């Protein structure tokens, strides 16, 4: 988990130096687990978008941004609120192959959610923006069964929160990123990628100035294709150009040493992960 977060932290600098190593080392594994434990606790009832647990999670993330020194982006708020129509579904997870089967039981439901925005201004290239996203909503609960969503995607949100803190430590010591960074945990993902779609249609910062979106999902997942946890699936890094793909390869080969797995970076993959990743772009 730590190595995966390190590569995500370094890419926005588009370089790797002793300062970058120093600030990546400020990421604390215990803090990561603390964030995951809180976000996936029963008290948040699975963080279904529009429900009280999702609102509690949003405020928890916003308070973290405030505590590490990220200012509210406008009108003294960290939230981009949205209201959309969506279908609601229950997913059953097959433990053998992690296939999700959806049963639709209500449509035309009004969903009210929030994206949480933490903006860190850059230096000489501050008009260019890199967005780091992770969805903080999950499936909620069904009767007495709570879908806690520790890995999907409290783990990714915890990573994004720690990346934000590392950037702020670097910035306060005069080593902030050249490009501006938007750390944006989104909601509505389990309802149909609603939060990320809403931001794309209603961007706070011009899309033409956004040069990359790095999305984090399930950074604690282990599977049968790898004999250890030192790997990451990369999807969509070569969609618009090879620049991000080549940067991933270069930084990883020199400094990180992860197994970069591209098996799902395929338009023909039946899981359609490649297609879903493009919606975030």
Predicted features, each with a name:
Residues 47-119:
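A non-catalytic alpha/beta surface segment that caps or lines the substrate-entry region
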Residues 1-23:
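Bacterial Sec-dependent N-terminal signal peptides
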